């Protein structure tokens, strides 16, 4: 019995030792202003799990939380931002976010309903020279592993407007993708969180999320 236990422990140790360490983490942005930056608790963990399975990435299973004045900001290739309410960047935070994005980082802003009027003026602090532009359906972000010929999937109805994907392009590079009237992050949450969401809606949201991660990592 003891011999069998040792063999089992040795086998498990071998598996643990052979498993590669995660290559990187995805982060959720903790911003100021009082908005619920922490919304959608299961979104990123579910997206990470999906990406690791579907894209064969090696992302750490637990999301990070990062503030714009944190030294480790530059270590995350993909930062996700969500919420319903107020957003406020200090001048220093806006400079740090600009440095992150112009240095190769990628920000996904997800309108969780009500974010639009707050986030647009704050992103103007970051890139006063840029405007959000709606990306054409031919953009590569819609054509990574998964094809979305009609753009973003519509997860929640909100005001009944069509889902739109906006981008900030810095020197030709997409540095920020803004999913509006879509609620992509809600679609990533555990099935059953929103009873009206079907498994098909959940799957479509995860596939689009995987495209975002794939694009952020390859910029292709």
Where in the sequence are the language-model features?
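An acidic, glycine-rich "communication" segment
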Residues: 25, 33-34, 42-43, 116-192, ...
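Aromatic-Pro/Gly-enriched surface loop or interdomain linker
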Residues: 17-78, 82-85, 183-184, 188-220
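Loop/turn elements at helix/coil->beta-strand transitions in domains of secreted/extracellular proteins
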Residues: 21-24, 74-78, 102-106, 130, ...
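Alpha-helical scaffolding within the catalytic cores
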Residues: 61-68, 90-95, 160-164
């Amino acid at each position: 019995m003891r011999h069998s236990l040792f063999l089992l422990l040795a086998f498990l140790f071998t598996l643990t030792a052979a498993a590669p360490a995660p290559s990187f983490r995805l982060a959720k942005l903790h911003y100021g202003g009082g908005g619920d930056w922490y919304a959608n608790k299961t979104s990123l963990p579910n997206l990470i799990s999906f990406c690791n399975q579907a894209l064969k990435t090696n992302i750490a299973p637990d999301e990070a939380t990062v503030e714009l004045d944190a030294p480790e900001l530059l270590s995350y290739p993909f930062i996700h931002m969500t919420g319903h309410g107020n957003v406020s960047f200090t001048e220093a935070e806006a400079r740090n976010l600009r440095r992150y994005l112009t240095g190769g980082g990628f920000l996904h802003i997800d309108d969780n309903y009500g974010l639009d009027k707050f986030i647009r003026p704050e992103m103007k602090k970051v890139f006063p020279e840029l405007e959000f532009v709606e990306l054409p359906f031919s953009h590569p972000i819609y054509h990574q592993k998964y094809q979305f010929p009609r753009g973003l999937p519509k997860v929640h109805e909100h005001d009944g407007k069509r889902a739109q994907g906006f981008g900030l392009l810095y020197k030709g590079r997409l540095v920020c993708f803004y999913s509006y009237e879509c609620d992509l992050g809600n679609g990533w949450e555990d099935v059953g969180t929103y009873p009206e969401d079907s498994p098909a809606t959940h799957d479509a949201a995860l596939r689009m999320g995987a495209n975002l991660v794939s694009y952020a990592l390859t910029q292709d």
